[in-house]
């Protein structure tokens, strides 16, 4: 007779320390969350990049990278972070005639000033159109 379904029976490697690995991953994730104007607004691209090149913007919140982060935070009922991310993103949306509606590739707060990147200094020179394409996915 087949055994009854249970979460314990579904584990592939019961002695793999999976719970410890997940707990450690959550600790690292929490360290990536940064504040904008006193409230957590998103996750940086990397805690520390090996090159430590100040010209790179790994310490910024990338819109594209934060869509799955925000979906995860929604599943964790951390709505305040998602709301802050959406609010900041909307506030930074371009209003100039040629680029109206385009979202920044990334943003960060430096010395109390919110700085947005519309592709000028982003890693790999990602265009802001890329960030704008991810917006409907999160809003859906």
Residue ranges of each PLM-predicted region?
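Acidic, mature catalytic/reactive cores of soluble proteins
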Residues: 1-140
């Amino acid at each position: 007779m087949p055994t009854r379904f249970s979460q314990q029976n579904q584990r592939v490697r019961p002695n793999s320390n999976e719970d410890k690995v997940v707990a450690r991953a959550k600790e690292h994730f929490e360290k990536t969350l940064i504040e904008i104007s006193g409230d957590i607004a998103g996750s940086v691209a990397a805690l520390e990049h090996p090159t430590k090149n100040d010209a790179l913007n790994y310490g910024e919140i990338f819109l594209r990278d934060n869509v799955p982060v925000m979906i995860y935070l929604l599943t964790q009922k951390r709505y305040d972070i998602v709301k802050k991310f959406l609010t900041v993103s909307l506030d930074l949306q371009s209003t100039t005639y040629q680029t109206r509606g385009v979202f920044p590739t990334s943003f960060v707060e430096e010395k109390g000033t919110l700085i947005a990147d519309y592709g000028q200094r982003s890693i790999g020179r990602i265009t802001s159109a890329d960030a704008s394409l991810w917006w409907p996915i999160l809003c859906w």
